[in-house]
Regions:
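Charged, low-complexity intrinsically disordered terminal segments
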Residues: 1-167
């Protein structure tokens, strides 16, 4: 989903770039292809035409739910949770749920980085487990629930991503 030297680990400031990707097969590929063409046509002077013959022809793969969410304009990413997320984490922990959070050890934006730490302290006090990724830069936006449900995306868990950047 990302194109640039930093995503390949070629920028020394960040080192190894840790992200999460997944392989999608079946009918869901058609939804992604449509979303790509619509986004391309919105951003480019060279318009792509939607032809049925150009679409990926999928063989049925099974019955797994999937949701494709349209994205909005690109912007600088931040990692500052808001009060509602911090409160939700605290409530979950105090209810006996094992909450684990991983954040990068290297800042991309120092102000945002330290603001994140101010929220993390409260989550730690409530009993959440917080890990700091040391092997490079953590860019992944992944949520796992009980090893059965996953969310892999581009949105940060913060006010800008949830309310401003159409993520």
């Amino acid at each position: 989903f990302n194109v640039g030297d930093e995503y390949l680990g070629k920028v020394k400031k960040y080192g190894y770039w840790r992200d999460t990707h997944l392989r999608i097969v079946g009918e869901s590929v058609r939804s992604i292809q449509t979303r790509f063409i619509l986004d391309w046509n919105q951003a480019s002077k060279h318009q792509l035409i939607l032809y049925d013959s150009a679409y990926y022809q999928a063989e049925p793969q099974g019955n797994v739910g999937m949701q494709i969410v349209s994205s909005g304009p690109d912007s600088d990413w931040e990692q500052i949770p808001d009060e509602s997320l911090a409160d939700a984490v605290k409530i979950a922990v105090l209810s006996g749920i094992d909450v684990r959070i991983m954040i990068p050890s290297k800042p991309d934006h120092p102000f945002v980085y330290w603001a994140t730490y101010s929220y993390i302290g409260n989550m730690l006090e409530a009993g959440a487990k917080v890990y700091i990724y040391q092997n490079g830069f953590l860019h992944a936006k992944t949520i796992m629930v009980d090893g059965k449900i996953a969310s892999v995306g581009t949105a940060n868990i913060d006010v800008r991503s949830c309310r401003l950047n159409f993520e």
